[in-house]
């Protein structure tokens, strides 16, 4: 009981201080549950909008850069160690659930064989509809549009358009080989 009360006071203080610091760019309903280790960062002219009754578990890390916008609907839950990197726009609907370790990037580095990886970024909007379940360790890439009532299975890497009412899952193929004594030695010695 005391712990819950302290967490409510902590969240109200955290929201109030961020509203003072960022002004209109930080539009967050007062009824939230932020873990003390949840990190919300706004850079430059970035904006953050969060609806009521949203929960952020331990280790969540959300960064909004430049003129980027992060908009999260109400009654949405982010499990442990979720990450969002928004340089353009990420929109998450209401009544969504994100499993542990979900990563969302609306940006990607530019690459060429001549110059290698550049710090310049390519960006594209991401939208996630209402009533979606994004399972553990899913990676959502720039330009992804997920409709309402979708389930994205654990470990998927998604991009592109996913229509409403879709279950997305990936197939992992495991191969098994028996190791005999000769193979063990070859493996250990590198022969």
Language model region names:
Residues 114-117, 180-181:
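Short acidic, glycine/proline-rich loop/turn micro-motifs
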Residues 153, 169-170:
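H-loop (His-switch) and adjacent beta-strand-loop-beta switch element
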Residues 108-109:
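Extracellular/periplasm-exposed beta-strand and loop segments of Gram-negative cell-envelope proteins
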Residues 116-128:
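Glycine-rich NAD(P)-binding loop of Rossmann-like domains
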Residues 145:
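Residues immediately N-terminal to the Walker A/P-loop in ABC ATPase nucleotide-binding domains
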């Amino acid at each position: 009981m005391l712990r819950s009360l302290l967490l409510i006071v902590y969240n109200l203080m955290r929201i109030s201080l961020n509203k003072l610091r960022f002004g209109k760019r930080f539009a967050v309903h007062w009824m939230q549950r932020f873990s003390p280790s949840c990190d919300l960062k706004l850079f430059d002219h970035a904006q953050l909008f969060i609806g009521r009754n949203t929960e952020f578990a331990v280790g969540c890390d959300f960064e909004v850069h430049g003129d980027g916008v992060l908009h999260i609907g109400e009654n949405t839950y982010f499990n442990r160690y979720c990450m969002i990197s928004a340089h353009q726009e990420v929109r998450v609907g209401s009544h969504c659930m994100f499993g542990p370790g979900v990563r969302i990037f609306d940006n990607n580095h530019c690459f060429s064989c001549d110059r290698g990886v550049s710090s310049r970024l390519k960006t594209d909007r991401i939208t996630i509809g209402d009533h979606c379940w994004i399972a553990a360790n899913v990676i959502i890439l720039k330009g992804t549009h997920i409709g309402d009532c979708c389930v994205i299975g654990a470990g998927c890497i998604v991009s592109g358009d996913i229509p409403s009412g879709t279950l997305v899952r990936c197939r992992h193929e495991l191969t098994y080989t028996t190791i005999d004594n000769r193979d063990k030695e070859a493996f250990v010695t590198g022969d």
